[in-house]
UniProtKB/Swiss-Prot annotation:
Name the record gives this protein: Tryptophan synthase alpha chain
Matching Gene3D superfamilies: Aldolase class I
Keywords noted in UniProt: Amino-acid biosynthesis, Aromatic amino acid biosynthesis, Lyase, Tryptophan biosynthesis
E.C. code: 4.2.1.20
Stored PROSITE patterns: TRP_SYNTHASE_ALPHA
InterPro entries for this protein: Aldolase_TIM (IPR013785), RibuloseP-bd_barrel (IPR011060), Trp_synthase_alpha_AS (IPR018204), Trp_synthase_suA (IPR002028)
CDD domains, sorted: Tryptophan_synthase_alpha
Originating species: Methylibium petroleiphilum (strain ATCC BAA-1232 / LMG 22953 / PM1)
Active-site residues from the entry: 49, 60
Cited HAMAP family: Trp_synth_alpha
Known catalytic reactions: (1S,2R)-1-C-(indol-3-yl)glycerol 3-phosphate + L-serine = D-glyceraldehyde 3-phosphate + L-tryptophan + H2O
Record keyword Zinc present: no
Top EC category: lyase
Stated family: Belongs to the TrpA family.
Name of the gene: trpA
Length: 272
């Protein structure tokens, strides 16, 4: 059983919703990423999504786009991202880490090399935003062969066929993009999410995490009744970008602790 699957199984037994924060590797300080990851894990993050910086992050809004630009300006590439995961693993061997990014950095690094190095670094899952499931079965199989979970996106516009395609090859969890558009945009409609998730679960048997538009504890708590996981990205990146180096990890940890408390106070709807 993968580290991600084991985490969700444990949480299911506890009737708790997973908390999955996202940060961009190397932002806001190249030497702070591991400290932020450790602080978030210590504060109650169940899985950490670590964004690989890319110059054209088409699915991301201005907050994460700027974070990518800042990280790239510091020289953060795939090699540096994997080194951060290795460093994190020296202190934490239990919290799953998912690399989230785009095809270009993976292919530029070399797919075979990426899979091997991600495994050796201690990565648990990979989400490539612009790899549609129907076109990357070989890549998904290669990841699974290295005990890495291939993770995919679904959206309000996803067809039944897309859900079936994702359900066939996804492992770990599926990330449901709860809003049309880019990350950090719009207002989250929890009723619409609650209507959509049963449709997804007809085809997808791994846990379903919900992201995009989650900015505070109240929204996260509302989603805890229907989602297996809550994913928060833009709000965290926004909080961290304004912090000085000496306090950035603590601020990240404090925010995660507030979300964790909200999720744990609303367990009645979590699926057994």
């Amino acid at each position: 059983m993968s580290r991600i699957a084991a985490t969700f199984e444990r949480l299911r037994g506890q009737r708790r919703t997973a908390l999955i924060p996202y940060i961009t590797a190397g932002d806001p300080y190249a030497d702070a990423t591991v400290d932020i990851m450790l602080a978030m894990a210590g504060a109650g993050a169940d899985v950490i999504e670590l964004g690989v910086p890319f110059s054209d992050p088409m699915a991301d809004g201005p907050v994460i786009q700027k974070a990518s630009e800042r990280a790239l300006a510091k020289g953060i590439g795939m090699g540096q991202v994997l080194a951060m995961v290795r460093s994190f693993r020296e202190h934490n061997d239990t919290t799953p880490v998912v690399l989230m990014g785009y095809a270009n950095p993976v292919e530029r690094y070399g797919i075979d090399r990426f899979v091997a190095d991600a495994k050796s670094a201690g990565v648990d899952g990979v989400l490539v935003v612009d790899y549609p499931p129907e076109e990357c079965e070989a890549f998904a199989a290669q990841l699974q062969g290295a005990d890495l979970d291939p993770i995919f996106l679904l959206a309000p516009t996803s067809t039944e066929q897309r859900m079936k395609d994702v359900g066939r090859i996804a492992r770990g969890y599926v990330y449901y993009v709860s809003l049309k558009g880019v990350t950090g945009a719009g207002h989250l409609d929890t009723d619409a999410v609650a209507t959509m998730l049963p449709r997804i679960r007809e085809h997808v048997k791994v846990p379903v995490g919900v992201g995009f538009g989650i900015r505070d504890a109240a929204t996260a708590k509302a989603l805890a009744a229907v989602a297996d996981a809550v994913v928060i990205g833009s709000r965290i990146v926004q909080l961290l970008e304004a912090e000085p180096r000496e306090s950035v990890a603590a601020v990240g940890g404090t925010f995660i602790a507030s979300i964790r408390e909200a999720l744990d106070s609303s367990t009645e709807g979590v699926r057994a």
